[in-house]
């Protein structure tokens, strides 16, 4: 776990420039390589910020049906979802807003339509995910806007040649069918194809209706999703390789909605989200230098409509977003460290059509950023730093920086301290929407301090961290002036302990968290964040049976009852949740899996007024050849 003097130097010299954008290599001593923390490859143990890696093997072992189910197991993560599969969700990292999390897909910023500026991970197909790298703490000095609470990098595709076919059934009419293959075309070309279809009848999420939002809807709120992925990679020579990828998904979700003011017969209770992504890149490596260039385009359409009248009716609404990205990154190996320098450019175009289709808003924003990151080891001390400047078409130049230091004061034990600044730029809808847009908005800004100690005590690898995050100029909607303004401040304090150890065939992972997220002006607790969390993951294998037990305790939380005016604060009680999963290899090719989610059928809410599904059963089978 802790960094050794030989680990960083040896690992980087061996693996640093072998497909460094993917971050899925391991060193000779089985220390995983990651790239997300500082935009260069490094052993996971050398990263000074808290970092977690989830592999495809982990996802299969846990039998997660969506990305939210994967992330909820990780330290610092709190998820609030409006019901079951496909319903809107919010992701909070260390108590920061859901819009303060930077989500990357294959290292490229996720394009998210809508006015919130927050990434809704409930809509990303789990079958698309090969690996997740998760960094806690500010990273705007590395990536720019949004990275106040942390960064999640979702890596797609398939990691080795072969073909996998799988199918699954579960509660509430759940069914999924999945296939992927990777084949070599000659010695230098690799083709990867994947597809998925998922369907669930769902259940009635209720959504606190009837109330101010709309009528009671005693129906199932289901979900259907389709996904296709294709990739091509070619090794031109020892120095150059290139790749091209295209993938897309179409999702449809039912929810408890609202009546349209212009047509009382139009009940807006269906969401259709369509996303298409095209990217290509070229990598070069030669000795101590490596470089990568990526170009990417994404288009997302987000409809909300009444099935009675259709998505193109005048009662429907549409958020459409286009995103262009260019990235150029360069990595240099030093004697006992690495540095990375580069630039990225992004253009976003957003179009929103109102519910009467007569009001159309079309906005464009572009951003150019330059960055420099580095890590250097000097004896028992590891130093890390980053600086970045962004030129935004709306608010001009904005600079951020961060620095960290780690001291291995005793063999196997390390003290770590860090400080970082971060920001969140206002999105186009907040700036220019006809419904309260404010072109004078300033970026939200944060300052975060963190101190910690980590060590290897017998079989136990552990880390204790304490942090404080002060966030200024928070953007919120004012009902008094009917517009968006920089009106709030937040102070978030937290303590986090993580540990992992093995006892014979049993593998244990434990997280203990205490969080105090408050509005700095009113001292109110920020909504939908648990003050205490306990997470425990137990995995073991006995007689070819691969078992997994997951426990999560969510402490007291608060929310708002938006069906009242003015909205009232309500308390959501704590809850303990258990999951049980088991898999069995019938043959060397066929594996069957079963899972019980919410084993003891606990009744609880993540969002006030929205029911959770209760106990659920899942059964899947996969065939590899």
Curated annotation (Swiss-Prot):
UniProt GO cellular component terms: cell outer membrane; pore complex
Signal sequence residues: 1-21
List of residues binding Ca(2+) 1: 204, 217, 219, 221, 256
Positions of the TBDR plug domain: 43-157
Principal subcellular localisation of the protein: membrane
Subcellular location: Cell outer membrane
TM annotation in the entry: 163-170, 174-183, 189-200, 223-233, 238-254, 271-285, 287-304, 317-333, 336-345, 363-379, 381-391, 395-410, 413-427, 445-454, 460-469, 484-501, 505-520, 528-540, 546-561, 569-583, 596-607, 613-625
Motif range (TonB box): 31-38
A single GO molecular function term of this UniProt record: metal ion binding
Purpose: Involved in the active translocation of vitamin B12 (cyanocobalamin) across the outer membrane to the periplasmic space. It derives its energy for transport by interacting with the trans-periplasmic membrane protein TonB.
Similarity comment text for this entry: Belongs to the TonB-dependent receptor family. BtuB (TC 1.B.14.3.1) subfamily.
PANTHER family tied to this protein: COLICIN I RECEPTOR-RELATED (PTHR30069:SF53), TONB-DEPENDENT OUTER MEMBRANE RECEPTOR (PTHR30069)
Protein name, per record: Vitamin B12 transporter BtuB
Lineage: Bacteria, Pseudomonadati, Pseudomonadota, Gammaproteobacteria, Enterobacterales
């Amino acid at each position: 776990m802790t960094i050794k003097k030989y680990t960083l130097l040896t690992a980087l010299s061996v693996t640093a420039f072998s497909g460094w954008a993917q971050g899925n290599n391991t060193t000779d001593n089985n220390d995983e390589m990651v790239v997300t923390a500082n935009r260069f490859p490094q052993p996971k143990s050398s990263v000074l910020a808290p970092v977690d890696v989830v592999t495809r093997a982990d996802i299969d072992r846990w039998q997660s049906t969506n990305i939210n189910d994967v992330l909820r197991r990780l330290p610092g993560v709190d998820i609030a979802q409006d019901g079951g599969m496909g319903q809107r969700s919010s992701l909070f990292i260390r108590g920061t807003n859901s819009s303060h999390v930077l989500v990357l897909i294959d290292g490229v910023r996720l394009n998210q339509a809508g006015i919130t500026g927050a990434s809704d991970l409930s809509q990303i197909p789990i079958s698309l995910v090969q690996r997740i790298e998760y960094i806690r703490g500010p990273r705007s000095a590395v990536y720019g806007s949004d990275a106040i609470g942390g960064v999640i990098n979702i890596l797609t595709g398939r990691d080795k040649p072969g073909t996998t076919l799988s199918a699954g059934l579960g509660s509430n009419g759940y069914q999924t069918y999945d296939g992927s293959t990777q084949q070599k075309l000659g010695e230098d070309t690799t083709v990867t194809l994947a597809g998925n279809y998922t369907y669930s009848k769902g259940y009635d999420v209720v959504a606190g209706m009837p109330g101010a939002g709309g009528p009671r809807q005693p129906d199932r709120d289901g979900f259907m999703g389709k996904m296709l992925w294709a990739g091509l990679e070619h090794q031109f020579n020892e120095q150059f390789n290139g790749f091209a990828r295209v993938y897309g998904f179409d999702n449809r979700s039912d929810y408890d909605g609202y009546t349209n003011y212009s047509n009382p017969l139009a009940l807006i209770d269906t969401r259709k989200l369509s996303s298409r992504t095209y990217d290509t890149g070229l990598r070069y490596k030669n000795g101590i230098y490596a470089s990568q260039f990526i170009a990417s385009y994404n288009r997302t359409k987000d409809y909300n409509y009444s099935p009675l009248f259709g998505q193109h009716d005048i009662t429907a609404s549409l958020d459409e977003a286009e995103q262009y990205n260019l990235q150029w990154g360069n990595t240099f190996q030093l004697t006992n460290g690495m540095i990375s320098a580069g630039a990225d450019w992004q253009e976003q175009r957003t179009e929103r059509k109102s519910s009467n289709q007569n009001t159309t808003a079309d906005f464009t924003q572009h951003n150019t950023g330059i960055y420099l990151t580095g890590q250097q080891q000097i004896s028992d001390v590891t130093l890390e730093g980053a600086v970045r400047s962004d030129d935004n078409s709306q608010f001009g130049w904005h600079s951020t920086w961060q620095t960290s230091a780690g001291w291995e004061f005793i063999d196997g034990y390390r003290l770590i301290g860090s400080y970082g600044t971060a920001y969140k730029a206002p999105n186009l809808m907040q700036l220019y929407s006809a419904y309260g847009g404010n072109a004078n908005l300033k970026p939200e800004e944060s300052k975060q301090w963190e101190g910690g100690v980590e060590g290897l005590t017998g079989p136990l690898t552990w880390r204790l961290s304490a942090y404080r995050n002060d966030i200024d100029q928070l953007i919120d909607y004012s009902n008094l002036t009917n517009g968006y303004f920089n009106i709030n401040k937040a102070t978030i304090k937290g303590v986090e302990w993580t540990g992992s150890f093995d006892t014979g065939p049993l593998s244990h992972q434990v997280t203990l968290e205490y969080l105090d997220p408050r509005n700095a002006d009113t001292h109110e607790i920020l909504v939908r964040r648990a003050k205490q969390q306990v997470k425990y993951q137990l995995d073991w294998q006995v007689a070819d049976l691969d078992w997994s037990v997951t426990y999560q305790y969510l402490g007291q939380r608060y929310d708002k009852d938006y069906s009242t005016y003015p909205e009232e604060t309500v308390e959501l009680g704590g809850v303990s949740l258990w999951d049980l999963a088991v898999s069995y290899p019938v043959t060397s090719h066929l594996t069957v899996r079963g899972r019980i989610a919410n084993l003891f059928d606990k009744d609880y809410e993540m969002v006030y007024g929205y029911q959770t599904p209760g106990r659920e059963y899942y059964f899947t089978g996969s065939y590899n050849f």
